[in-house]
Amino acid sequence: MTETGTTESGGTPRARLARRYLEVNGEHPMTEADDAYVDRQFAPLEPLCARHGRDPDEVRGHMLDGRLPLPGYLRSDGTEMVAPDLLELVDEAGGLAKLPDWFRGHWADREEGEEEYESYLSGQNVCLHRLHPVTMRRKAELVRGITEALDRPADGPSGRLPELPALHAMVDELDALEPQFTAYDRLRFGGPVSRDTCIDAVRRDHPLD
């Protein structure tokens, strides 16, 4: 570390984290509407660290080293936006060292648990109001259930899907778990998000009435 707070590997922790974020998410502009959405759903990293008595650069270092998730978003002014309960999850796990095994242990299938943990660390899991292994697992179950229901043959000439009330119950539960997403998400993910395909499209194309 130099006297200016930079490192020989390429600038301040904040600058290096911004570069890593863009490597993962690509370079897509954040509009005023995107910023406003993110302000409602996420928390700026530095004030969050202050509330928890954490050093922001230390937290950034953990993100860069793959011990904590990357920010979910960078606002247009460069502010790192993270899940409001980012550090609470670490406390629930019993500390940063215990987080990986605690997190993976929520899945019976070890490989699936590892995949979900890597997804968590990417910072791209912005699809839940509360980012937690329990809600991640439930979302995956609901998306699978909805997809399977949509793949079933329709009932006769009516064109209605079988067990439509059960399908809508899953859609309603998923709706409660997920935020609205923003236009930026559809750019970085390259198309529709799960809210588009598993909530809005189902309600539009397969209404109960």
Spans of features found by a protein language model:
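The DNA-recognition helices of helix-turn-helix-type DNA-binding domains
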Residues: 66-67
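Long, charge-rich, low-complexity intrinsically disordered regions
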Residues: 5-24, 30, 71-209
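Short, amphipathic alpha-helical "recognition" segments used to contact nucleic acids or chromatin
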Residues: 28-40
